[in-house]
Regions:
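Active-site microenvironment for binding and transforming phosphate-containing groups
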Residues: 1-167
Length: 167
């Protein structure tokens, strides 16, 4: 295992790569034309640091992926209706280099709900990925108690593993 990284990629056959998540977004990128794969872990902290944007830009610049032929698959994660944060998080999200307002729902109690999956999808679109090649998850880890782990929900350790390899 590689510690303290939120993204890994390979262009080599028979090497399994992946990321562990609970409520955070796991993103699996695959470009079969290269071939190459990448796994990204992005909680709200990774999102405000634009991990997906930076990773995809790097992969495109180094010709590891082609945005027109790359597919993106999202793991189950905490979704828009469940991811409540404070205004200090909103202030950080507003520093991203695109319009984030569609991904924020303000509440009267100085809290807001954010669409972490949506923010990461927008980063993929901003880098030229085709919307038809992006596959969001409909599973909300906070609500799918029988099928998903949610640290926010049960405060227990449990994780999903988003992984892949090139045959």
């Amino acid at each position: 295992s590689i510690m303290n990284v939120d993204a890994v990629y390979t262009c080599e056959k028979n090497i399994l790569i992946g990321v562990f998540t609970a409520d955070c977004v796991g993103i699996f990128l695959v470009d079969e034309t290269k071939p190459s794969i990448c796994c990204i872990h992005s909680g709200w902290k990774g999102t405000v640091q634009a991990i997906t944007d930076k990773c995809v830009k790097e992969l495109i610049q180094n010709k590891i992926i082609n945005p027109k032929t790359t597919k993106a698959f999202f793991s189950p994660s905490i979704l828009f209706d469940s991811l409540e944060v404070g205004m200090e998080v909103i202030d950080q999200i507003k520093q991203l280099n695109f319009d984030v307002e569609p991904f924020i729902r303000y509440m009267p109690n100085q809290k807001a709900f954010i669409d972490n999956q949506g923010l990461n999808i927008q980063m993929l679109l901003n880098n030229g990925l085709n919307i038809d090649n992006i596959y969001p998850s409909k599973l909300d880890t906070k609500k799918e108690l029988n099928d998903c782990f949610s640290f926010r929900n049960d405060k227990k350790t449990g994780e999903h593993f988003t992984y892949g390899y090139i045959k």
